[in-house]
């Protein structure tokens, strides 16, 4: 058996309602910086650390890496779903971004690209598939993966036996994701065999099962 730990990044400036930045450049908020420092004390010692290409995962992992002298390794397949192009949201706060996000999901087209630099849902699902089929077997037991909320929700969706290929699949996933609470700085345990991931569950803050 193998276990990995998925950590959603700490609160970002976007989570706190801030003005839009390019997705890869979004930093942590002041509250997120405190959450990251708390995680460094909570997580198990001396583990391999993997992050997405997004700044907020790097900043979340940084206190742990500094504490244990670990260098984070980048896994592009962990990148969050970036479905709104920066050109469409530049200068907007969270409230102003919301109707654009709702319109995207209501379209329910897995192959629709909203603009330059944006992902399609099919591409996003491909990243999660890459993680499940290629990356999982290669990762060492006990590794820490700092990632993102929608990504973790799609992983949970796929592990439950659901598909993410059609417009109906996409709409059903959105309803599932909207009802699944994945808090900033929460830690999730991903269990499976050496060949395949099987189950994902959230650990309580006082978990002693690392």
Q: What do these predicted regions represent?
A:
Residues 1-5:
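Extreme N-terminal starter segment of soluble prokaryotic enzymes
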Residues 12, 151-152:
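Short active-site segment of divalent metal-dependent hydrolases/proteases
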Residues 43-45, 135-141:
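Glycine-rich phosphate-binding loop signature in dinucleotide/nucleotide-binding domains
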Residues 52-54, 77, 142-150, 157:
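Short, well-ordered beta-to-alpha junction loops that form the rim of enzyme active sites
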Residues 63, 154, 158:
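Active-site signature of alpha/beta-hydrolase-fold catalytic machinery across serine-
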Residues 81-95, 157-210:
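Acidic, low-complexity terminal tails and accessory targeting/binding regions
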């Amino acid at each position: 058996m193998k276990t990995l730990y998925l950590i959603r990044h700490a609160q970002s400036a976007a989570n706190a309602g801030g003005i839009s930045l390019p997705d890869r450049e979004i930093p942590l908020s002041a509250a997120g910086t405190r959450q990251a420092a708390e995680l460094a004390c909570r997580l198990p010692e001396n583990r391999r650390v993997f992050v997405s290409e997004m700044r907020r995962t790097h900043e979340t992992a940084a206190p742990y890496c500094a504490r244990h002298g670990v260098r984070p390794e980048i896994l592009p397949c962990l990148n969050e779903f970036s479905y709104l192009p920066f050109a469409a949201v530049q200068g907007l706060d969270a409230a102003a971004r919301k109707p654009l996000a709702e319109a995207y999901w209501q379209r329910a087209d897995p192959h629709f690209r909203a603009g330059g630099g944006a992902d399609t849902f099919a591409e996003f699902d491909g990243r999660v598939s890459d993680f499940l089929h290629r990356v999982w077997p290669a990762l060492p037991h006990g590794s820490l993966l700092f990632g993102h909320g929608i990504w973790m929700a799609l992983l949970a969706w796929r592990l439950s036996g659901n598909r993410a290929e059609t417009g109906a699949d996409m709409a059903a996933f959105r309803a599932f994701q909207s009802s699944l609470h994945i808090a900033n700085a929460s830690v999730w345990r991903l269990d499976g065999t050496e060949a395949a991931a099987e189950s994902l569950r959230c650990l309580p803050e006082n978990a002693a099962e690392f």
